[in-house]
Amino acid sequence: LIRRSWFYSSAITLALTSCIVFSATAQQKREVGEPEAATGYIEKKAFVAEDYMVVAANPYASWTGKNIIEKGGSAIDAAVAIQSMLSLVEPQSSGIGGGAFILYWDNKNKVLHTFDGREMAPSAVDGHWFMDGNKPMKWLEAVVGGKSVGVPGAVKALELAHKQFGKLPWNTLFDDTIETAEKGFKVSPRLAKLVALDYHPGLKTFPSSSTYFYPAGMPLKEGTIKKNKALAKTLTGIAEHGADYLHTGELAEKIVKAVNTASINPGKMTLEDLANYTPKERDPVCGVYRDKSICGMAPPSSGGINVFQLLKMLEGQPLSTMKPDSVAFANVYSQASALTYADREKFIADTDFTKLPYAAMINTAYLARRAESIDADKPWRKAKAGNPYGDAEIAMGTSMELPNTSHFSIVDKEGNAVSMTTSIEFMFGSGIMVGGFLLNNQLTDFSFSPTKNRFPVPNRVEPGKRPRSAMSPTMVFDDKGDLEVVIGSPGGSRIISYVAQTLIGIIDFGLDIQQAINLPKMTNRNDYTALEKGTPIADLEAPLTKLDHTVKVVDLNSGLHGIQFKSGKLIGGADPRREGVAVGQ
């Protein structure tokens, strides 16, 4: 059994001594679509280990994963513990009230498994769920309250994975978080700053959330020792009774009541919706870039498809001769990215409802045709979606997918690995808190309008459907089939770009994973070219404008966490834009 007092004292000491200090002048204004504001940047160096490694978004989470592996646990065991801890210490980003995508590498049998724990639409919704008459609701009006809450899936997916690949008993995996919730954790700078922004319209409205995040009417302060006994009780129930404790019984009744009686935007969730949720195992999406196999999640995640598309369309470009902050690289990267996002918006949705075979979108010949227009000297143009499906009558939809998410990467002592991206969507989700955790607002990842020009939008709202996601947990394998990289990021729909750019840094520019994560970020979602503020890449604004780019210099708050196998060592990388740390041995 885990010695809970040892963990608590170690974790609290780490948090008290190694919390990141952010600039007091950190920009607090948000770009449209970036509500989880940037909270600063601190340079990080690669962490090297030999036996195992954990990289997560908060020191408490990294150390509980390390603790589990030291007790003989597997990568999946560590993932269960990390997710429970993130629910406590990083509640704005993910939690047991949300969903997740999990990649698991079984090193002994050399098999990659994927688990879909994406949230699901309740049975009572319809295609007009977010329509206000003939017009779609404004996104910020739709996000708050019960209407946006999807049936959670993260715990169910972890339970399914644990039944297959866990080593330690399920009921031992929550001990660290339960103890920390009972005794208190140190509120991090990032959590305190995000609460202080006072941006979420519902966080002060719902009593349970308001009481927790605004004690005595004031926002949580950095350094406060915060307890969450309600979450400790919930996790004790999950530890003893499994995921059904969340999906059936008294807690399920509380969730349904909170959703359906919300004072803002009440929803229509049923006990049957919660009880009937089923996580799914899906085939991974894999393709070869250079001599590497790039593998990710299948739909409803667009990550596996789109990360590979973006990379493959750049394969004909001499990227290794370019500099990461050069005009040439920024121009070709933006062109490939625009082509990728055009396809994403038109074609990708939950394939249990949209029967378009995604293999056509990663077909080598199709991507070669798409890439013919990419040229380092060519002015940028808004891209049109391709035509991988012939004459299928499909309308291009839009959805607002926001960057409130968390990612962690794990390699255990046996070489098994986890890449898991987990989310409640918006900063603090729907704003509704039940049982000490926040409920997601993932239904706003659907396209609000069900049709466009009389044609159906693939990512429209439907009962039992899972909304499209850009979450991109990714693994990279060499030409012999050996695992080389485990990576992923938060960042809303920009996740695809963050992961692809980092992989280019490793594969084409020859950087280690920390150097690649540190690279100044740029994105183009077929709208404008975003350059990371305060970095050398921002100097490209003028030359890219001359190439007809619409350029915005903004904060780009990725949260990449990854592990690289190199020369017999494990190299861990944690994003300097967030609070994550790499630990191991």
Please give the residue ranges for each predicted region.
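Bacterial N-terminal signal peptides
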Residues: 9-21
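Noncatalytic scaffold domains of N-terminal-nucleophile
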Residues: 27-63, 67, 75-76, 80-242, ...
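Internal maturation/activation junctions in enzymes
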Residues: 31-32, 316-423, 575
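Active-site rim segments in enzyme catalytic domains, especially the processed small/beta chain
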Residues: 88-95, 99-113, 265-270, 416-480, ...
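Short, small/polar residue-rich loop motifs at catalytic or cofactor-binding pockets
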Residues: 280-281, 402-405, 469-471
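Glycine-rich phosphate/pyrophosphate-binding beta-alpha loops
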Residues: 295-304, 405-409, 419-431, 468, ...
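Extended C-terminal subregions enriched in glycine
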Residues: 464-466, 499, 508-555
